[in-house]
């Protein structure tokens, strides 16, 4: 099951913008071979969609729950589904916050 390909969608709430969160996620996801994207949302949250091995996605979820220093994660909503294969790489999408 750990090698099973899956998709993780997550919304991270709290003090998560302006603290380098997106670039931490980008570096981590790229290092462990995930594809997808991360972006800031207008409501102050951070949204992430990622695909890859389930075990690596669980590692990403753990990172999302902790956040970088300077952040304060209060809640992570997440869901699992089958991988679609639609992403070629992991990227930071233009968000609605200009702080990082």
Regions found by a protein language model. Give the residues of each.
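Intrinsically disordered, low-complexity, mixed-charge
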Residues: 1-100
